[in-house]
């Protein structure tokens, strides 16, 4: 396999990547990619007199007997090179299914915890061009399968962004997305630095491993070009969706969201994307659903109703209205001092001295709020209010969306598709949507 040279440091990193004077967290597993990143970044920061900001963080998932020894090896290597190092362990029972996804979430949660403790504003990871190509191919294959079923959306084909925001607070930087894995290993060999190969990277039961084995240089170059195009399309679509929001086409009344349909013909694709994004927010879903042929037909026809991703979408001549489907709405007990996310829509903290129960309101409780006046007569919408979050404490029930938040409790709406990770190219859309969903009670 041929490799490309590693670009000059000023191409990989820029001063804007590391503004401020806080710590810079680098995720280092002990593999070749992350170790090469660590030493490349150390070189760059040394050239700017900022090497002391660098902190390597190793997450020990505890999934292999060798993991603790490997983490200790990274710590020793960092000590020899004057790099501050921390090891964090994934504690608790490991799931029997969906292990890779849960491990990934746990890894980023621990990295964010380290960043919080260190006062860092940025987390840097060593994803490479090979990783990017593999991600693109996997998503392309899934999207093609979905297209066959009339559900493809293509949104994920932009693959991994160089810059994103993680957990609403930390900048996630991937500076090596243009660099081949082989080039990084050559760099380490030239510096006489060894690395550890994870045996999971050769497990044929892994989708990524199977894709990796099929990729040659030409396929990787082709995937790289396709990602650039897909990213441009996604960024452009996000800007158009943000413009639609900023034109006052979206408003929230209680628990029902309204989108104006008139005059969107020239931006139909962006409007469809906005509807799907809002459906994910209303339904409390992390993934934005594809605009299927059935949904698109409904939006074009201007008359009908469909449920998508836990959200009811009602289309009329002049508007699209969305509210949460009355289904799978859990009751949650929140002890004093605890916090939780309810239904993927609300982040709630109980700072009071009494337990709080989170649930949907009973029919009689809703009527009491309106003094027995039907909600529709007040301009509000009964079906959507039946899915709102009611807070019950010491026998008293409060509906924050209508009555305000009781003392000792904090509550905020969540824009779930943007809550854990948002690409830099979609931050304009997030900025446009946040005022719409800001909690005004």
Model regions: which residues?
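Acidic, metal-coordinating catalytic cores used for nucleic-acid/nucleotide bond scission
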Residues: 63-68, 202-205, 303
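Residue-level preference for alpha-helix termini and adjacent loops
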Residues: 62, 98, 135-140, 156-165, ...
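Bulky hydrophobic/aromatic packing residues
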Residues: 40-44, 87-93, 123-124, 170-172, ...
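Flexible helical/loop "lid" subdomain adjacent to adenine-nucleotide binding pockets
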Residues: 128, 133-290
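AMP-forming adenylation/ATP pyrophosphatase catalytic core
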Residues: 17-23, 29-30, 90, 164-169, ...
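ATP-dependent adenylation/nucleotidyltransferase module used to activate substrates
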Residues: 2-150, 182, 328, 395
């Amino acid at each position: 396999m041929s490799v490309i040279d590693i670009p000059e440091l000023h191409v990989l990193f820029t001063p804007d990547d590391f503004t401020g004077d806080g710590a810079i967290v680098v995720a280092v597993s002990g593999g070749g990619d992350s170790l090469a990143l660590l030493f490349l970044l150390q070189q760059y920061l040394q050239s700017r007199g900022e090497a002391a900001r660098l902190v390597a963080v190793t997450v020990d998932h505890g999934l292999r007997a060798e993991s603790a020894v490997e983490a200790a090896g990274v710590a020793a290597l960092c000590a020899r090179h004057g790099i501050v190092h921390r090891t964090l362990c994934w504690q608790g029972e490991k799931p029997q299914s969906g292990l890779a996804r849960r491990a990934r979430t746990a890894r980023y949660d621990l990295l964010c915890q380290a960043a919080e403790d260190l006062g860092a504003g940025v987390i840097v990871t060593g994803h490479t061009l090979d990783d990017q190509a593999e991600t693109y191919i996997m998503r392309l294959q899934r999207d093609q399968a979905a297209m066959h079923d009339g559900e493809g959306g293509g949104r994920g084909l932009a693959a991994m962004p160089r810059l994103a925001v993680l957990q609403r607070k930390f900048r996630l930087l991937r500076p090596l997305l243009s660099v081949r894995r082989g080039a990084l290993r050559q760099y380490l060999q030239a510096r006489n630095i060894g690395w550890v190969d994870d045996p999971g990277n050769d497990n044929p039961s892994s989708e990524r491993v199977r894709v990796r084995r099929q990729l040659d240089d030409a396929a990787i170059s082709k995937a790289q070009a396709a990602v650039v195009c897909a990213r441009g399309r996604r960024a452009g679509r996000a800007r158009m969706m943000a413009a639609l929001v900023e034109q006052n086409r979206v408003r929230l009344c209680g628990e029902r969201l309204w989108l104006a349909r008139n005059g969107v013909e020239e931006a139909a694709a962006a409007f469809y994307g906005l509807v799907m994004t809002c459906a994910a927010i209303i339904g409390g879903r992390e993934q934005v659903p594809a605009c299927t042929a059935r949904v698109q037909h409904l939006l074009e026809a201007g008359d009908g109703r469909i449920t998508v991703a836990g959200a009811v979408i009602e289309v009329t001549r002049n508007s699209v209205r969305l509210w949460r489907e009355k289904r799978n709405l859990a009751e949650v007990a929140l002890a004093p001092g605890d916090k939780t996310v309810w239904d993927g829509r609300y982040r709630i903290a109980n700072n009071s001295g009494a337990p709080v129960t989170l649930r949907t309101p009973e029919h009689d409780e809703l009527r009491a709020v309106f003094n027995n006046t039907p909600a529709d007569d007040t301009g509000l919408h009964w079906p959507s209010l039946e899915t709102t979050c009611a807070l019950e404490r010491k026998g008293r029930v409060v509906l924050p969306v209508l009555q305000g938040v009781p003392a000792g409790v904090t509550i905020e709406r969540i824009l779930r598709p943007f809550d854990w990770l948002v690409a830099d190219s979609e931050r304009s859309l997030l900025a446009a949507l946040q005022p719409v969903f800001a909690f005004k009670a």
